[in-house]
A protein has these predicted regions:
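FAD-binding core of flavoproteins
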Residues: 1-121, 128, 244-270
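Alpha-helical interface subdomain recognition
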Residues: 1, 72, 101-270
Length: 270
């Protein structure tokens, strides 16, 4: 039996889940990456509180899609059976690393970006100075650049998806796609403004463009810099996997004990 305390923010996107994948510190004095354990905790256990978190990328308050709605989970002396431990005590980082590799395009999210599809249709049907936008050489050049960047991310995601299901060992590939997707999404916000002007900054049904998707991308491009590790973290992972990172292990930045909101799991007798 373990007693879990603490909280976690930005939890999603499957709202109303029956189980929570949870990583918690099980050896406070242990070395980094060797002091945490992974649990699959029953969401109905006493002491668990879930609060919705509506983010900048939400279309409106109360939205429940994966982009705009996450959760904050609180654990208050939650008694967790030992058989909820996954991978053995203090092996949580190994389990988490596998989970992150799946998150970094191993889950099969390889469709064409819907923002691109809507943007292309808009430029084909909307007119400026009496002719379709797509007939403007500058517009065509920008569309070509947008497609090339988004397609590069999609193809690399497809490669990673294949590697997972072919049983191929991956190294830097997961973080590579995560880094490119984040930086491309942020770049896309500016590219859309260059194409659509002020219409890209409002979701007004009359003044906005592509059914509000352009404005939503402005917010989503910022929010998507965080999940699964920031761009700086992805670059560190890539460097380490390629063997060009720091030669000596470096201590990660830490908050003061009063500012820490980490989860801890203390073993107790059932």
């Amino acid at each position: 039996m373990y007693v879990v305390n603490g909280q976690k923010i930005y939890i999603g996107s499957h709202h109303g889940a029956d189980r929570y994948w949870t990583i918690a510190v099980t050896d406070p004095k242990g070395k980094r990456h060797q002091n945490v354990s992974w649990f699959m905790i029953d969401a109905s256990l006493p002491g668990i509180t879930t609060q919705p978190l509506y983010m900048l990328s939400a279309q409106s308050e109360g939205e429940t899609d994966e982009h705009g709605h996450k959760n904050i989970i609180f654990f208050d002396n939650v008694r967790v059976p030992a058989d909820c431990l996954v991978g053995g005590e203090n092996n949580g980082w190994k389990v988490a690393s596998t989970h992150l590799e799946v998150e970094h395009s191993g889950q099969g999210n390889i469709r064409t970006n819907p923002v691109w599809t809507a943007l292309l249709a808009h430029c084909r049907t909307q007119h400026r100075d009496g002719r379709p936008l797509i007939e403007d050489p500058d517009v065509r050049a920008k569309l070509a650049e947008i497609f090339s960047r988004l397609e590069a991310v999609r193809l690399l995601s497809t490669r990673n998806f294949w590697m997972v299901y072919a049983g191929e060992k991956r190294s830097y590939e997961g973080s590579q796609v995560s880094y490119l997707r984040k930086t491309t999404n942020l770049w896309l916000t500016k590219a859309i403004i260059e194409l659509l002007g002020p219409a890209a900054l409002t979701n007004d049904p009359v003044l906005g463009a592509i059914d509000g998707m352009a404005e939503a991308q402005q917010r989503r491009g910022i929010v998507e810099q965080h999940p699964g590790g920031t761009t700086d973290i992805q670059r560190v992972v890539i460097a380490r996997r390629l063997g060009v990172g720091a030669r000596e292990p470096q201590q990660a930045g830490r908050l003061g004990e009063e500012g820490m909101a980490r989860k801890t799991a203390q073993p107790v007798e059932a």
